């Protein structure tokens, strides 16, 4: 086998026909500036080809069901193994996916509980054992003497059909009576059942009267019934109750039998185990009165009912006015002045009481109705169920909240399933443990000799999988945590742990920044995991910017030298020491500290005002009070799972945004937020896409395209032709090419081959029709402008201040290499975040804006971080406030103020460990952040002195 993966002539995206030799069975880091071509090499070339070759080995029939990969633009690749990509984009948002199900730990738990779980009665809690025939006889003999009994075996339960064969079989076996749907019938009568109705059929085995001496006959009849009824017998007391006995599991005291205990019973995705009320979701989404009526001091006319406030002339408002008018109120009456009964009418409906409604409809027709008022909440529920529009559905969901299912209280499973325990814990209690707690629980579990034999293999798998999750720094996650709530880094590390669990050898793993979201403290464990995967006999290609990972790598490939068109070349390749010596490598310059991010000489003190969160206790936060100083650059730090995102995103952002705007979802639990009067805007700049379709691009998102279209409409040619700005939009009829509807490309479906995208034959990919493209500004068409990079745009629009301002800020945030018309779907998370940042920077500062960023360094090289920090510091210099959640020490050391949460993750986190300047935090021994910050601040002083 070859010792190298040899790539020849890679040209995907911006790669410049490069050749690379990657050593096999080694840990290889691919690094470089954001947009330099790292992912193009690792994912779009090497992974795509490895995956494509594997899929090509399957039949054409199988291929049509698999995600097809295009053949990458490369001459050839040798020495390639089957490739597995572990990226951050494939997080499941299915509400049924949990940490337990994704890691397959839940599958082993289901098996363990089914095989060695101890059943209890869901009603009285007593341990349940299987009933013997003797116990059944004793139970029946305790009934009042002379009670008449029917001993029956059920053979059909709730099935459609005429069941003629079944009835004929009963007749042949010599039985005289059957009970069909509760009615006892002589088997020799003509029985015609409705074909499309569900029927239940029991064979009457014997008829008895309770008295002394019948025990033997009763036992024989029970045994026959148990044999026919698969371990279950029904005893009908004539004119009395129906008793059920089971050879399987049943509570003798309560008369409750459990079905046969099988792994599927413990699955909340199976009808055998799922709570019937919520179908195993554990929650209900419903309209929340606090979101529908966020400010109860308002009147209906002032927007009391938020979902109805957008259209004050709607029929719903006419109805509300009619209800109020009847009782002497108006739309201008404040809510707290309206009688409680009338409030109830408005919220939940008037029942039978009717009202007169009169209004003019959209056709100017006068209409009158006399009917009850259904109520605002039922009206919203009805509209939500009836609408076919995704946009309307999404707008309604902004007023809904998720509440635990009233029946299972969020447990997702049936009561009889939750009554089965191991070590006095049911499966829900085990999955509510953190991974660290679950690992400890299983280590201390004691089994009988028989149980030990049964559980041995299952326990081995559980210990291994929990151990791998501990190794990648996820001990704070609970097994019941929804997969959709995980960050990209957490989801990636879970998949990494799952891969280690699979124990494959000779595989090519390609990872995308596995250190994201991981505190410096946990880095060594992650690196040990990566090395373990390598030592099994696998090749790891890791796209990464983290210095610790580079020092641990066997080989580093630095792609660059710049981003976009200025990148796509191999600048340097070798060990970390060789990269440090390479003067052309920007990575080497930062590793050797020839370049570095300086520690500020002094920290800002702020403007004296604060935003204070009081009594934060969502998730693991321990009722803490946190002050955020305004006018400074604040970084919230702490180990993974310490409560940073909960505090900043769920409480601070949602709490403030719900007061300033209408937002989706409720803020996390807290008492109050003080100091809201000191800000007028709060903006969360996250890494979600700037648009979900290729029609969204940086020019449309920032709003600069409006000014560009305006500029083109002012040219002489456009004025002569009467073209308005709308003519230069590729989204509407008029100026766009109608053959491709302004996309520039046409999709051709190839069924079991990948879909092919070809340039539109009419416009040749220009998006516009010929007439529109005849209008030029400085020799360029509107299509040429969309194909310009930001750097080119800066030069081209230098004399148009309105446009140049946007170009300059896009350049300042390090996006000079992207095209103005680059589809949003091709931008990375980090690029999308910086487009949003530029969009905000281009606006005039009010000095009262609070910006929130969650791990903005994701996907950024140290050089990009340097540039990003300059931009964030500019925002603060303008009087605004920036709050960042971050693990990157280069960002942490440049902050004015730090809030360090911890000390650990999960239940052992959620408190403030330290707060103050980075220098203050470095002195706190209990702070993990401080421990790593201290040497960095000392190094910063030395470097500042060196270059002074």
Question: What does each model-found stretch correspond to?
Answer:
Residues 1-948:
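Conserved phosphate-binding elements of NTP-dependent enzyme cores
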């Amino acid at each position: 086998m070859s010792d190298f993966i040899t790539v020849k002539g890679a040209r995907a995206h911006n790669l410049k026909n490069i050749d690379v030799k990657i050593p096999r069975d080694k840990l290889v880091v691919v690094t470089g500036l954001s947009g330099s071509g790292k992912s193009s090499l690792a994912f779009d070339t090497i992974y795509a080809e490895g995956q494509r070759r594997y899929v090509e080995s399957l039949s054409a029939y199988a291929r049509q069901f698999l995600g097809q990969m295009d053949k990458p633009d490369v001459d050839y690749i040798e020495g390639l193994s089957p490739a597995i990509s572990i990226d951050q984009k494939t997080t499941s948002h299915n509400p049924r996916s949990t940490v337990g199900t994704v890691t397959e730990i839940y599958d082993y738990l289901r098996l363990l509980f089914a095989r060695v779980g101890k059943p209890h009665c869901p009603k009285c809690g007593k341990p349940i054992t299987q009933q013997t025939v003797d116990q059944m006889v004793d139970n029946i003999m305790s009934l009042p003497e002379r009670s008449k009994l029917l001993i029956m075996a059920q053979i059909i339960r709730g099935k459609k059909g005429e069941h003629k064969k079944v009835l004929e079989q009963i007749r042949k076996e010599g039985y005289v009576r059957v009970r069909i749907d509760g009615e006892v019938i002589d088997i020799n009568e003509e029985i015609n059942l409705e074909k499309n109705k569900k029927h239940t059929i029991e064979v009457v085995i014997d008829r008895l009267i309770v008295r002394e001496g019948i025990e033997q006959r009763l036992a024989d009849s029970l045994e026959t019934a148990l044999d026919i009824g698969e371990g279950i017998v029904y005893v009908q007391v004539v004119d009395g109750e129906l008793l059920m006995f089971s050879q399987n599991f049943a509570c003798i005291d309560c008369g409750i039998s459990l079905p046969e205990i099988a792994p599927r019973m413990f699955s909340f995705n199976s009808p055998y185990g799922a709570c019937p009320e919520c179908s195993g979701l554990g929650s209900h989404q419903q309209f929340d009165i606090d979101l529908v009526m966020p400010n109860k001091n308002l009147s209906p006319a002032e927007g009391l009912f938020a979902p109805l406030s957008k259209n004050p002339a709607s029929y719903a408002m006419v109805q509300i006015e009619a209800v109020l008018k009847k009782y002497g109120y108006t739309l201008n009456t404040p809510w707290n002045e309206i009688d409680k009964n009338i409030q109830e009418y408005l919220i939940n409906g008037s029942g039978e009481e009717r009202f007169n409604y009169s209004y003019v409809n959209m056709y100017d027709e006068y209409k009158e109705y006399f009917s009850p008022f259904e109520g605002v909440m039922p009206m919203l529920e009805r509209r939500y169920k009836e609408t076919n529009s995704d946009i309307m559905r999404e707008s309604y969901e902004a007023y809904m909240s998720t509440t635990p299912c009233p029946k299972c209280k969020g447990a997702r499973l049936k009561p009889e399933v939750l009554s089965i325990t191991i070590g006095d814990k049911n499966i829900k209690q085990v999955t509510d443990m953190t991974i660290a707690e679950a690992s400890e629980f299983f280590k201390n579990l004691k089994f009988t000799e028989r149980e030990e034999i049964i559980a041995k293999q299952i326990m081995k798998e559980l210990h291994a999988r929990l151990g791998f999750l501990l190794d990648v720094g996820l001990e704070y996650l609970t097994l019941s945590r929804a997969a959709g709530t995980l960050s990209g880094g957490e989801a990636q590390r879970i998949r990494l742990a799952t891969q280690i669990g699979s124990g494959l050898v000779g595989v090519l793993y390609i990872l995308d920044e596995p250190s994201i979201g991981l505190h410096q403290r946990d880095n060594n464990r992650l690196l040990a995991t990566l090395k373990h995967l390598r030592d099994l006999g696998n090749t790891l290609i890791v796209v990464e910017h983290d210095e610790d990972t580079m020092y641990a790598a066997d080989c580093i490939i630095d792609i660059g030298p710049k981003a976009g068109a200025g990148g796509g070349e191999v600048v340097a390749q070798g060990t970390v020491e060789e990269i440090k010596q390479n003067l052309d490598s920007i990575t080497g310059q930062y590793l050797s500290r020839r370049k570095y991010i300086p520690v500020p000489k002094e920290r800002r003190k702020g403007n004296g005002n604060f935003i204070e969160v009081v009594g934060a206790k969502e998730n693991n936060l321990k009722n803490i009070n946190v002050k955020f100083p305004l006018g400074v650059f604040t970084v919230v730090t702490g180990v993974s799972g310490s409560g940073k995102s909960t505090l900043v995103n769920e409480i601070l952002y949602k709490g403030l945004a719900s007061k300033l705007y209408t937002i989706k979802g409720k803020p996390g639990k807290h008492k109050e937020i003080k100091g809201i009067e000191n800000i007028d805007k709060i903006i969360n700049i996250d890494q979600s896409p700037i648009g979900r379709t290729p029609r969204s691009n940086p020019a449309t998102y920032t709003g600069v395209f409006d000014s560009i279209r305006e500029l083109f409409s002012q040219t002489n040619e456009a004025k002569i032709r009467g073209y308005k700005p709308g003519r230069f939009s590729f989204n509407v009829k008029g100026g766009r090419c109608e053959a491709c509807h302004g996309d520039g490309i046409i999709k051709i479906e190839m069924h079991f081959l990948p879909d092919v995208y070809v340039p539109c034959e009419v416009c040749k990919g220009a998006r516009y029709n010929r007439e529109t493209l005849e209008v030029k500004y400085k020799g360029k068409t509107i299509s040429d402008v969309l194909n310009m990079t930001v750097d080119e745009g800066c030069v081209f629009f230098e004399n148009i201040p309105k446009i140049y301002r946007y170009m300059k800020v896009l350049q300042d945030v390090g996006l000079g290499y992207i095209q103005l018309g680059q589809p949003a779907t091709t931008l990375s998370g980090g690029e999308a975040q910086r487009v949003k940042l530029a969009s905000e920077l281009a606006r005039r500062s009010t000095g009262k804006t609070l910006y929130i960023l969650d791990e903005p360094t994701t996907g950024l090289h140290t050089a990009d971080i340097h540039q990003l920090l300059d931009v964030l510091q500019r925002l603060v210099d303008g009087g605004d406030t920036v709050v960042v959640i971050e693990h990157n020490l280069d960002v942490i050391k440049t902050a004015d103020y730090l809030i360090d949460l911890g000390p650990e993750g999960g239940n052992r986190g959620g408190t403030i460990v330290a707060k103050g300047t980075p220098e203050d935090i470095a002195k706190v021994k209990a702070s993990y952040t401080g421990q790593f910050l201290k040497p960095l601040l000392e190094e910063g002083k030395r470097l500042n002195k060196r270059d002074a």
